[in-house]
Design a protein with these regions (language model features):
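Trp/Gly-enriched beta-strand/coil motifs that build multi-repeat beta-propeller-like domains
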Residues: 1-184
Length: 184
C-alpha cells in the first residue's frame, strides 16, 4: 500500500489557506506559502453561511473559498487573489440534504472538483471549471460510518483518488475514479 503523511497531503496544495470565522459572521483568511503568510483577507457574512471547503477552482494556482448555507442547501464560490475576492459564482441550491464532502482534482484538469454527499450516503461528483459545472454524475453510495477523509493523487496519473475511512471498523478504502466510475 501507499503510506500517506501530512507533508505528502500538504504537498498537493499549491498555497494552503487558513480560514477563521467568529459567531457574528466575521471571516478572515490567510494564504500560506512556504510556511509564511503571503496574503490575507477579511469579509462579513451572515451566520447561516459557512466556508466548507477550499480549492483552486480555475487552475490559477490560488485557493478559493466554497460557501454553504446549510438551511437552504445553497452553495457559493468566492474566487480569491490573496486578500481580494476577484469573482463570485452562485453554485445553486441542491437542498439541505446535500453537503460538500470533499474537494479534489478528480478528472486531472488542474481545477478543483466537488464531491457531494446526500444524507442517505449517495456520492455525487461535479467536474468544475470555476463556477461552471462541466459534467456531473453519481459515483456510489456508502453507509453512515464511512467518511471521505482525503483526496490525493496516489498513482501519479494527475487525478485525485478519494480516501474513505470507517471510524467503527478502522478500515480505509481508496477509490480510483475514471470519469464517474469508481474502483477500490
Amino acid at each position: 500500500g501507499t503510506a500517506l503523511s501530512a507533508s505528502r497531503l500538504l504537498a498537493d496544495i499549491p498555497d494552503p489557506i487558513l480560514v477563521w470565522r467568529d459567531a457574528g459572521g466575521a471571516v478572515a483568511w490567510w494564504m500560506l506559502a512556504s510556511g509564511t503568510v503571503s496574503g490575507a483577507g477579511f469579509a462579513q457574512a451572515t451566520p447561516d453561511w459557512t466556508v466548507v471547503a477550499t480549492g483552486d477552482s480555475a487552475a490559477s494556482g490560488r485557493q478559493d473559498l466554497y460557501w454553504r448555507n446549510a438551511t437552504l442547501g445553497a452553495g457559493y464560490l468566492w474566487r480569491l487573489d490573496g486578500a481580494a475576492v476577484t469573482g463570485t459564482h452562485d453554485l445553486g441550491v441542491l437542498g439541505p440534504q446535500w453537503r460538500i464532502e470533499r474537494t479534489g482534482d478528480f478528472n486531472g484538469d488542474g481545477r478543483t472538483d466537488l464531491l457531494f454527499r446526500r444524507d442517505d450516503g449517495l456520492l455525487y461528483l461535479w467536474h468544475m471549471d470555476g463556477g461552471t459545472v462541466l459534467s456531473q454524475g453519481a459515483i456510489g453510495q456508502l453507509g453512515a460510518d464511512w467518511q471521505a477523509a482525503g483526496a490525493l493523487d496516489t498513482d501519479g496519473d494527475g487525478r485525485d483518488e478519494i480516501v474513505f475511512f470507517n471510524a467503527a471498523t478502522r478500515e480505509i478504502w481508496l477509490w480510483f475514479l475514471d470519469g464517474f466510475a469508481a474502483t477500490a
